[in-house]
Amino acid sequence: MSKTTIIERIWPAKEIIEDLSELRKQSPLTHVITNIVVTNWTANVLLAIGSSPAMVIAKEEAGEFAKIASGLLINIGTVTSNDAITMKIAAEAAHQAKIPWVLDPVAVGALGFRTELAKELLNFKPTVIRGNASEILALAGTDGGGKGVDSTALSSDALPLAQMLAEKTGAVIAISGEIDYVTNGKETISISGGDPIMTKVTGVGCSLGGVIASFLGVQKDPLRATASASAVFAIAGTRSAKISKGSGSFAVNFLDQLNLLSTEK
């Protein structure tokens, strides 16, 4: 059971509209260090919401660039030894420069190298940690029961430990699932929506980390920024699924729906 009251936030709540409007106005420069499977898709998703993505991954440049970005995403999905160096450099630079950053610990707990890397990255105080229930449970120190990048646990199952992890790390924890939960340990927001077909298009979940990083660049309250990003993602998924014949048309429609979301009151 959750130890805090859960507040539901869905599109078109006032806070979400305001945050998306501000994002489109500012077009925040978002530094993305992500896995090779989803790089192109993530860039297109960020462009669709109005952000300015930059995929700077050279270890010689990552620290310098992280300091001038509005937000940073580090996703360890296809991490290599060289990638790990880049990630630690960027995370440290963002931490020193007080740039908000998101850690997406893909498949943490399933494999040793990435699990140790994720724990090292926690030293640089991520603003937000986003993952599925199994990943969050594993990062919190329990057996998440995941199978690679997929979760075998419900997001609600992970919520109590997510709240503890938030208090321990100081990060906002975002758990993706049939219902998304966002918590700072004291406050918890639920976001419903989306569609199961979102799990059938590679990169959809990973790109949410970039969307959160973009919202962090314009909304200084990380709990609110993460909830707004998740709600925008959910409504675009819901609307796209209704007009799609399958995963191929969904991918195109999802980008369109992100782009077409109206912030007019």
From Swiss-Prot:
It comes from the Bacteria. The keyword Transferase applies. ATP binds at residues 130, 176. One of its GO terms (biological process) is thiamine biosynthetic process. Its cofactor is Mg(2+). Substrate binds at residues 55, 203. SUPFAM superfamilies: Ribokinase-like. GO terms for molecular function: ATP binding; hydroxyethylthiazole kinase activity; magnesium ion binding. Gene3D superfamilies: 3.40.1190.20. It catalyses: 5-(2-hydroxyethyl)-4-methylthiazole + ATP = 4-methyl-5-(2-phosphooxyethyl)-thiazole + ADP + H(+). It is an enzyme of class 2 (transferase). Its EC number is 2.7.1.50. Pathway: Cofactor biosynthesis; thiamine diphosphate biosynthesis; 4-methyl-5-(2-phosphoethyl)-thiazole from 5-(2-hydroxyethyl)-4-methylthiazole: step 1/1. Catalyzes the phosphorylation of the hydroxyl group of 4-methyl-5-beta-hydroxyethylthiazole (THZ). NCBIfam families: PRK09355.1, thiM. This is Hydroxyethylthiazole kinase. It comes from Leptospira interrogans serogroup Icterohaemorrhagiae serovar Lai (strain 56601). The gene is thiM.
